[in-house]
Amino acid sequence: MDTLKPGLKGTAELTVAREHCTSRGGPWVFMTPAMVQFSEQSCHNLVAPLLAAGQHTVGTVVYIKHLAPTPEGMKVRADMELIEVDRRRLKFKVQIFDEMELVGECEHERFVIDVDKAGERLQKKIAAMKR
């Protein structure tokens, strides 16, 4: 985790497919929940190779502004930057562009977890459901 430092940057691309869209009676456009998922996954992918074995990140905070529509079939690009590291908390700034303009801005936080510890905690909840 010592390799996770502010200033780490990356880019991800996605072609907007029907499953990323909503219509609301008009043309199919990139929907906000898909923009959130794209931002989260892109930030995860940026830092995942730098984590220790047995670690993973989970999203904890998302603040997003969806600024403009993007039609189905157009590519979108996420430009991510890790802007803050506070122990296990990672804060990112993400800008989302389509082929013509800035379409979204996101502030996102992820938390580095130990997979085994998180799994134990989850198993306790699953066991409690079975009672």
Stretches with model-predicted labels:
Residues 104-106:
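A structural microfeature
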Residues 32-36:
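Conserved N-terminal beta-strand and adjoining loop/helix that marks the start
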Residues 64-99:
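Hydrophobic beta-sheet segments that form the core/acyl-binding groove
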Residues 109-131:
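C-terminal output/interaction extensions
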Residues 15, 97, 109-113:
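Short beta-strand edge segments in extracellular beta-sheet folds
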Residues 45-77:
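Hydrophobic beta-strand-centered segment that forms part of the acyl-chain substrate-binding groove
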Residues 1-31:
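Catalytic strand-loop segment that frames the active site of acyl-thioester-processing enzymes
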